[in-house]
């Protein structure tokens, strides 16, 4: 090989290496996308969500005016949520309303502001529950509150702090500072 040919090959090889280096350097300078974890992953208006149990029966329905989902926390926030629970026969049993709600990945629904739980079946002795904040396990339908709770039944009203109950079994227990009033119906006998 002649000296001139060697020099041409060396110069061309160096030129190729320089071009590869420049190309690699340009790729490193690309702007990285900045993700703000305070922004929701997605937003939705006027949502209607139906959730079914593993057997395929309707478990609950969750309607909201506005929903924001945060994927980094696996949390959904609902504005003006209305939850309707269903029994095994697909009959609506309870309606739950609040100002805001947070649904976590473990299917816990945290309700905030003007929480109201209303019975939708006529045979329930417990007709309505009101409180400021509550938590509902959407799998077991256990409901709890650490705030002042008022229970309205067919023949009683009861209020107290801290409540534990279960929507499926239609019961609620007030834990502290309980005050109850009963309506006693007089039976009139005919002489």
From Swiss-Prot:
One of its GO terms (cellular component) is outer membrane-bounded periplasmic space. Disruption phenotype: Leads to irreversible cell damage, growth arrest and an extreme sensitivity to SDS. The chain crosses the membrane at residues 7-25. It is found in: Cell inner membrane. The keyword Lipid metabolism does not apply. HAMAP family: LPS_assembly_LptC. Interacts with the LptBFG ABC transporter complex, but does not affect its ATPase activity. This is Lipopolysaccharide export system protein LptC. The gene is lptC.
């Amino acid at each position: 090989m002649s000296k001139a040919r060697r020099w041409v090959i060396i110069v061309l090889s160096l030129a190729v290496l320089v071009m590869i280096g420049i190309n690699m350097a340009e790729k490193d300078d690309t702007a990285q996308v900045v993700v703000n974890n305070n922004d929701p992953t997605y937003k939705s208006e006027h949502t209607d969500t139906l959730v079914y149990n593993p057997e395929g029966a309707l478990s609950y329905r969750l309607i909201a005016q506005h929903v924001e989902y945060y994927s980094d926390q696996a949390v959904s926030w609902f504005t003006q949520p209305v939850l309707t629970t269903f029994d095994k026969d697909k009959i609506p049993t309870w309606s739950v309303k609040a100002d805001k709600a947070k649904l976590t990945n473990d299917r816990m629904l945290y309700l905030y502001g003007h929480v109201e739980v209303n019975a939708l079946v006529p045979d329930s002795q417990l007709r309505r529950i009101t409180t400021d904040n509550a938590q509902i396990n959407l799998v077991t339908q256990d409901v709890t509150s650490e705030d002042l709770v008022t229970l309205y039944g067919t023949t009683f009203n009861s209020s107290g702090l801290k409540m534990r109950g279960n929507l499926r079994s239609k019961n609620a227990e007030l834990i502290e500072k309980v005050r109850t009033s009963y309506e006693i119906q007089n039976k009139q006998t005919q002489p």
